From Swiss-Prot:
This is 2,3-bisphosphoglycerate-independent phosphoglycerate mutase. InterPro entries: Alkaline_phosphatase_core_sf, BPG-indep_PGM_N, Metalloenzyme, PGAM_B_sf, Pgm_bpd_ind. One of its GO terms (molecular function) is manganese ion binding. The lineage of its organism: Bacteria, Bacillati, Cyanobacteriota, Cyanophyceae, Gloeobacterales. The gene is gpmI. The active site is at 69 (phosphoserine intermediate). Belongs to the BPG-independent phosphoglycerate mutase family. Pathway: Carbohydrate degradation; glycolysis; pyruvate from D-glyceraldehyde 3-phosphate: step 3/5. Catalyzes the interconversion of 2-phosphoglycerate and 3-phosphoglycerate.
């Protein structure tokens, strides 16, 4: 389809995603409440506001399961509740169909014929964001049933989607399962900071890769013991240094099963193993190596996939492209995949008329050292994109509340929230000048809960709702002004895409089963009047 020319300015719909900015009435341990947010407060008081659900069944997860950025952006872009891989794989484990998965059986057969070893790689916790320990238990059952002497486990400790020192309990559970069944070997251990980097910090990936591939007897210690020693030395689960515990290196002829189901933090380590032309760091190419991932991490990777991607049609970006309209996506490195790959339903290639901008995240060990991250640079480029007046849809992600919130540093998270608040103000001004409509929301909670009831740091996401504010501009308006409009209550992330389509005057496809948050409101042209000024 031909794209609309830019000779006549468009009135954009601007979706601003405040990653990890949840809503919670209690102020104790609430970095959002503690922060000075004059822009957000003024917008909330003067424009249509509601709370939306971002966790559990509302976004395709099990009841009570906290949301995350992948799930959030997938639901945002799809305009519907999308059943998640966590549920899909858990059902396969529970129902026993994992044991007959054709791709898993094919890999096992190949490795047996070569006389190789079988390895399981992934995050060992029940956080449910990247993996689940029950999936590893299912894999142990499969490997034993397929006649392998053992499954060599290369386990990564969490401490990010779970409490910072909870890894001991997870690895004790794994050790107990191994002792009970007499099957399985924890060969290596390392914090997710190393094995699950997604920001091209190749030195981190290399540290995990080396431990997994270099031969040796290991320390002979239990994983749980090693974690306790790490905690005593001041390193929480996320930052445990990679170490070999027992013999069982990944070697040519072996098979590797990566049991994480979320792609973004599993890609780098996978590439190091399977890409012949890999250049992240110098390493010998292990060939032959049978490699399988639980889900599709990247369609270009030469790996088998146990659970093929589900097809999603008529997503928001596709509808925009189908109508010949232009769109713009922007985020810093840490969240770039979310506004592109995940927002587009797991498709890497840009849509027709879709332009992207990735701003480099600061190169610091942890983001509490620079809570501003790249928010100001993201805002600079976003404002410039708005001012071109050529994009009908602009999607912006601010990573700060989530990424700094994950560090557990309360004061730094407060500063992160305040940084984003100032950036929102600049976006509002640009939106006003462009005559656009801004939809301000979040993908899940995090920064609103920084410690638990016992006063321990809480670094994981939450099940709290998130704010949704509809910010009107001049020209194209929602009927009513300010608090006159009552947005529909009880909505979820899948309802935002239908809301955007209604604002843009585009038909909602049948596959998009979410419901517009505008309720009975209708779009109309109104007499221009000065929009709210928020002290900018």
């Amino acid at each position: 389809m031909a794209f609309m020319g830019t000779s006549s300015a468009v009135h954009p719909a601007i979706l601003v995603i405040l990653d990890g900015w949840g809503y919670r009435e209690q102020t104790d341990g609430n970095a959002v409440a503690a922060a000075k947010t004059p822009i957000f407060d003024a917008l909330k008081a003067s424009y249509p506001f509601t709370l939306i659900h971002t966790s559990g069944k509302a976004v395709g997860l099990p009841r009570g399961q906290m949301g995350n950025s992948e799930v959030g952006h997938l639901n945002l872009g799809a305009g519907r509740m999308v059943p998640q891989e966590l549920v899909r794989i858990s059902d396969a484990v529970e129902e026993g169909t994992l044991l007959s998965n054709p791709e898993l059986l094919r890999l096992c057969r190949t490795v047996r014929e070569r006389g190789g070893k079988l390895h399981g790689v992934g995050l060992v916790s029940d956080g449910g964001v990247h993996s689940h320990i029950e999936h590893l238990f299912g894999l142990l059952d499969l490997a034993k049933r397929e006649g392998f002497e053992t499954l060599f486990i290369h386990g990564m400790s969490d401490g990010r989607d779970t409490p910072p020192t909870s890894g001991v309990a997870y690895f004790e559970k794994l050790e107990a399962r191994i002792a009970e069944t007499g099957f399985g070997t924890i060969a290596t251990l390392g914090g997710r900071y190393f094995g699950m980097d997604r920001d091209r910090r190749w030195d981190r990936t290399e540290a995990m890769y080396r431990v997994m591939t270099e031969t040796g007897p290991g320390t002979g210690k239990r994983a749980s013991e090693t974690l306790r020693e790490s905690h005593a030395a001041g390193k929480t689960d996320e930052f445990v240094l990679p170490v070999r515990l027992a013999a069982g290196a990944v070697e040519p002829g072996d098979g590797v099963i990566y049991f994480n189901f979320r792609p973004d933090r599993a890609r780098q380590l996978t590439r190091a193993f399977v890409q012949a032309d890999f250049d992240g760091f110098v390493r010998p190419y292990l060939d032959p190596l049978a490699f399988l991932t639980f889900t599709q991490y990247d369609a270009t990777l030469p790996v088998a996939v146990a659970f093929a991607p589900q097809s999603l049609d008529n997503l928001l970006g596709q509808v925009i492209a189908h109508h010949g309209l232009r769109q713009f996506r922007i985020a810093e490195t840490e969240k770039y995949a979310h506004v592109t790959y995940f927002f587009n339903g797991g498709i890497e290639t840009p849509l027709p008329g879709e332009e992207r901008s990735m701003i480099q995240s600061p190169l610091v060990p942890t983001y509490d050292l620079k809570p501003e991250m790249a928010a100001r640079e993201v805002t600079d480029h976003a404002v410039a994109a708005i001012e071109t007046r050529q994009y009908s849809l602009i999607v912006i992600n601010y990573a700060n509340p989530d990424m700094v919130g994950h560090t557990g540093n309360f004061d730094a998270t407060v500063k992160a929230v305040e940084t984003v608040d100032a950036c929102i103000g600049r976006l509002v001004e640009a939106c006003v000048r462009a005559g656009g409509t801004m939809l301000l929301t979040a993908d899940h909670g995090n920064a609103e809960l920084m410690w638990d009831e016992q006063g321990n740091p809480w670094t994981a996401h939450t099940t709290n709702p998130v704010p949704f504010i509809l910010i009107e501009s001049e020209g194209l308006k929602i009927p009513g002004w300010g608090t006159d409009v009552q947005l529909r209550a009880g909505g979820s992330l899948g309802d935002i895409a239908p809301t955007i389509l209604e604002i843009l005057g585009l038909p909602q496809p049948a596959e998009m089963t979410g419901r517009s948050l505008l309720g009975e409101s209708e779009i109309e042209i109104r007499t221009p009047r000065s929009p709210l000024r928020v002290g900018l």
